[in-house]
């Protein structure tokens, strides 16, 4: 995303297209209908045979070709950024869901929806665990890789007494060895990948051993979910993502309180769109804290002189009304500046938590 954020504004139209690839109630995707409709409408507003129209038409053809060839591709969504005039074409398959189709046309890529997905669905490890087998996945906005660990299965005999006790000790030893191996592998993955979250779905008999053997630093990253009979990773990843989203929402209040305390004490915090934009210009922002609903942002009187020039066109499949383009542009300007300056981004789902400060604020690296 940092590469897209670093692109200079283009004199040609830059297309940012976000599509849900999930099927409707009759098993058919609706994204192609949306694409044809919005592209035809946008083309009518451009002068025929102009350089801008030529670039746009080539982008549309390339996007449609990509969608036709990747119609059966895995994933719940896709984000596509295209501008032939600026030699840009980037298609990003996404495992995370998108609520609605949306098209943005501007002088730069529109990154707010992608940044929101990345923050809401961070890269994390997920574990399916029982006493003799484990599957460890690394998920992000797409499924990245999987590792399977198989322990030795124990077979129960019909003998009782001393033989039964020996069997149980032997089984317990195998279970302990297997789970220790799982934890060792998980530790290596978490350290190598720099992961902050681990979601575990474990058999009832395995989880007490797993919890007991976890080192504290790893235990602090664990989110547990109930065990289900997930045959494939598809339903499993959806359940793990939902668990992370719930956990994230629970900590939103704490993050907003941290911001408010820093701001009110005159410390390392600013509140409101204008103050946050000014802090970005001075290189102060450590973490952007912004509403997950752009329509709840307070508009600014004037965008910074170095903001992306030109208008922003927005079309979505949302039937409840079109977005306020000035607020959408402001939200993207803030998020893009965060990625340009290596600032973290935190989206707050409950818009009311940031309502008193215009929907956005920032924790700072330093004061001036």
Residues of each region from the PLM?
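Terminal alpha-helical anchor/extension segments at protein ends
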Residues: 1-368
